[in-house]
Amino acid sequence: MSYYLVQSTDEDILKHAECGGAVTAFFKYLLDKKLVDGVLALKKGEDVYDGLPYLVNDSKELVETCGSLHCAPTMFGNMISKHLKDMNLAVSVKPCDAMAIVELEKRHQIDKDKLYTIGLNCGGTVPPQTAKKMIELFYDVDPEDVIKEEIDKGKFIIELKDGSEKSVKIDELEEEGYGRRTNCQRCELKVPRNSDLACGNWGTEKGWTFVEVGSEKGEELLKNAQKEGYINVKAPSEKALEIRGKIEKSMINLGKKFQKEQLDEKYPEPEKWDEYWSRCIKCYGCRDVCPICFCKECALGEDYLDKGTIPPDPIMFQGIRLSHMSFSCINCGQCEDVCPVEIPLAKIYHRAQLKIRETTGFVPGIDDSMPFLYK
């Protein structure tokens, strides 16, 4: 692996970026040189809790995508496979986005040769409504007064309209049931090395982006962007590498701790799951939002049910989904996010996947091989 500190040479990008603007600079280079048809990224909607997927065709609009949006837990994998698969794209990806793209490529739903994946180091995301309640309770401010947020050094930091900042330790927030989504708490993949380039601020100097190269395609992109004057590049110090490694290791260990707590020590008893399944209204939200569930025709779909009959029994519906998808679950948490009756679906899928991993060694989104059931 190769490591670099990267900084955009564009003053407008530097003005809007959080740490060097490398991600936006890579996107600008790709668009300007017509190496891609568009860039898929997030931009802020009405406020910091509203992250909108944005397809950019003009590099002048890229500054609208600068900065982090930790309260917008969206997924790009199924967006690409369902709506943009014929385009040459550059896309910003969290680790779970990158994992979804890997799994979809194996199933011929995405052609990765058409993609440049620019990874973003990720410590987790916060549901927008949870974020608003959390800010009201723990920061004692109106959530509408927040103009910017970031996660840094174990704290959730907000900036207000008057220019002031407030911060609270994430540990304290999560002890009270707030903070990051529970699937993010359990996540072990913090640096998306399964993307072409992995970018972040861990271990970096102020005003620079720490970039780890994940592929030959990524190395070529970085070198060409430097050659064309879009970025400044220098080598990170040994201390920077050490700091980054320590942060990543600490985050991974924390994820394993939450796995033990949520999927073992405090995992719901069978009776509780009976209660959860009885809530299911068969809305198909979990199926439709899952980035790995790609079947064009679903045996459980409404079109395949006799008219006048009730939809599948909840246990049958969820059981078939579990047997079909658990071996490839990437722990993105989307199924749990959209469930209108608050069934903790991500817990059972993630737990099942970890059991499969113990038995087979297969890690979805990381291994190049197909899941064992496909062999």
UniProtKB/Swiss-Prot annotation:
Residue ranges of every copy of the 4Fe-4S ferredoxin-type domain listed in the record: 268-291, 320-349
Catalytic activity entry: oxidized coenzyme F420-(gamma-L-Glu)(n) + formate + 2 H(+) = reduced coenzyme F420-(gamma-L-Glu)(n) + CO2
Gene Ontology molecular-function annotations: 4 iron, 4 sulfur cluster binding; formate dehydrogenase (coenzyme F420) activity; metal ion binding; oxidoreductase activity, acting on CH or CH2 groups, with an iron-sulfur protein as acceptor
UniProt-annotated binding residues for [4Fe-4S] cluster 1: C280, C283, C286, C339
Cofactor: [4Fe-4S] cluster; FAD; Zn(2+)
Induction conditions: Expression is induced by formate limitation.
Textual note on the cofactor: Binds 2 [4Fe-4S] clusters.
Name of one Pfam family that matches: FrhB_FdhB_C
EC number: 1.17.98.3
Binding, [4Fe-4S] cluster 2: C290, C329, C332, C335
Alphabetically ordered keywords of this record: 4Fe-4S, Electron transport, FAD, Flavoprotein, Iron, Iron-sulfur, Metal-binding, Oxidoreductase, Repeat, Transport, Zinc
Taxonomic superkingdom: Archaea
Further details from the record: The genome of M.maripaludis harbors two sets of genes encoding the F420-dependent formate dehydrogenase (Fdh), fdhA1-fdhB1 (Fdh1 isozyme) and fdhA2-fdhB2 (Fdh2 isozyme). The Fdh1 isozyme is the primary Fdh and the Fdh2 isozyme may not play a major role.
Subunit structure: Dimer of an alpha (FdhA2) and a beta (FdhB2) subunit.
Family classification: Belongs to the FrhB family.
Biological role: Catalyzes the oxidation of formate to carbon dioxide, with coenzyme F420 as the electron acceptor. In vitro can also use methyl viologen as electron acceptor.
Protein name as it appears in the record: F420-dependent formate dehydrogenase 2 subunit beta
Organism: Methanococcus maripaludis (strain DSM 14266 / JCM 13030 / NBRC 101832 / S2 / LL)
The organism's taxonomic lineage, starting at the top: Archaea, Methanobacteriati, Methanobacteriota, Methanomada group, Methanococci
